[in-house]
Swiss-Prot record:
Region described as Disordered: 1-20, 379-411
Lineage: Eukaryota, Metazoa, Chordata, Craniata, Vertebrata
Compartments it resides in: Cell membrane
Segments passing through the bilayer: 55-75, 93-113, 126-146, 169-189, 226-246, 295-315, 332-352
Protein name: Vasopressin V1a receptor
Organism encoding this protein: Microtus ochrogaster
Any one GO CC term of the record: plasma membrane
Length: 420
């Protein structure tokens, strides 16, 4: 995954097109790094050690994302349980994360390996469009799933009005909106001829911006559309969910206390009668805990994965003192690459909170199933042996001595005649 470079590539750059710099910015960064003004900043070289690190990180992310999301899809396909609306959203979220793996991470991995983009102009435009499309799809699928949970908890009566149809419309809207918002990539990126190695010409897939505000406008728009807006919506929806459940629990608790004191008075809140939406306090408590935990994990994972990338992007275009060689810092490069790690986390988060999905996923693989059966059998045998040993060492009086050592064993029993 990457944001565009500008119309000129400094010598210090790696193969990943991370920071969109103009020719003037690149030259000033080269001079600020301590090079002479007359030296050539256009050598077609890169930091090979850092490039190898980028390739390794992207390869691991790609493998983990594909395996994790494919396992979720396989578990959903083979589960014997009835498919719910949440399963529908999880399925499409996994598809969106697979799009991130194949349309975003994999092209960037190939690009890092070849250093320069190898392909015609139309392929350059398509690749850049699909990369951003995957970013939008993964973020917006999470948003519509959160919106569905908000409707289910805060407006339960609306779930009776064709809930499956509404869910499918929300999912379709997120896919279409993601495609439309990423369409400008076709007009921003193209194969551009650049000058390297003292006048040698080559081509690469770059973006062309109106200077000096074009780059800032693009990065700010992407940061707002992919990160800021989804985080605000996620936080707002889950905030209402937690508040609604907390108010429901408080109303139910007050009702129980009034019944215990013999007062037949319903709890009031701001002059309105508070009626619990769920019939069981225990059920509400579990739902509250599960919602709070899932909220914390989802929002935290999303922010931790995406925040470093967008912080670096915004810093690079809004800080006039930003030096190009700062992008060669391995820590900055790796934190930017880890944005795609969110697609690796999502399947395991939902399998953990869904419970049975993890079991269905394990049962989908024969090797894992045999391993689980072996461990279960070993545990059963160990329990059986412990139970047998415990039973043999207990006396008829449940003392710790053995049967033959018991004072009430068979040899001390006296047969007393019974009168008839």
């Amino acid at each position: 995954m990457s944001f565009p470079r500008g119309s000129y590539d400094p010598a210090a750059s790696n193969s990943s097109p991370w920071w969109p710099l103009s020719a003037e910015d690149a030259n000033s960064s080269w001079e600020a790094a301590g090079h002479q003004k007359g030296s050539d900043p256009s050598g077609d070289v890169r930091n090979e050690e850092l490039a190898k690190l980028e390739i390794a990180v992207l390869a691991v992310i790609f493998v983990v994302a594909v395996l994790g999301n494919s396992s979720v899809l396989l578990a959903l396909h083979r589960t014997p349980r009835k498919t719910s609306r949440m399963h529908l959203f999880i399925r499409h979220l996994s598809l969106a994360d697979l799009a991130v793996a194949f349309f975003q991470v994999l092209p960037q991995l190939c690009w890092d390996i070849t250093y320069r983009f190898r392909g015609p102009d139309w392929l350059c435009r398509v690749v850049k469009h699909l990369q951003v499309f995957a970013m939008f799809a993964s973020a917006y699928m999470l948003v519509v799933m959160t919106a569905d949970r908000y409707i289910a908890v805060c407006h339960p009566l609306k779930t009776l009005q064709q809930p499956t149809r509404r869910s499918r419309l929300m999912i379709a809207a997120s896919w279409v909106l993601s495609f439309l918002l990423s369409t400008p990539q076709y007009f921003i990126f193209s194969m551009i001829e650049i000058e390297v190695n003292n006048g040698t010409k080559t081509q690469d897939c770059w973006a062309t911006f109106i200077q000096p505000w074009g780059t800032r406008a693009y990065v700010t728009w992407m940061t707002s559309g992919v990160f800021v807006v989804p985080v605000v919506i996620l936080g707002t929806c889950y905030g209402f969910i937690c508040y609604h459940i907390w108010r429901n629990v408080r109303g139910k608790t007050a009702s129980r206390q009034s019944k215990g004191s013999g007062e037949d008075v319903a709890p009031f809140h701001k002059g309105l009668l508070v009626t619990p939406c769920v019939s069981s306090v225990k059920t509400i408590s579990r739902a509250k805990i599960r919602t709070v935990k899932m909220t914390f994990v989802i929002v935290t994972a999303y922010i931790l994965c995406w925040a470093p990338f967008f912080i670096v992007q915004m810093w690079s275009v809004w800080d006039d003192n930003f030096i190009w060689t700062d992008s060669e810092n391995p820590s900055i490069t790796i934190t930017a690459l880890l944005a795609s790690l969110n697609s690796c986390c999502n399947p395991w988060i939902y399998m953990f909170f869904s419970g049975h999905l993890l079991q269905d996923c394990v049962q989908s693989f024969p090797c894992c199933q045999r391993m689980v059966q072996k461990f279960t059998k070993d545990d059963s045998d160990n329990m059986s042996r412990r139970h047998t040993s415990y039973s043999n060492n207990r006396s008829p009086t449940n003392s710790t001595g053995t049967w033959k050592d018991s004072p009430k064993s068979s040899r001390s029993i006296r047969f007393i005649p019974v009168s008839t």
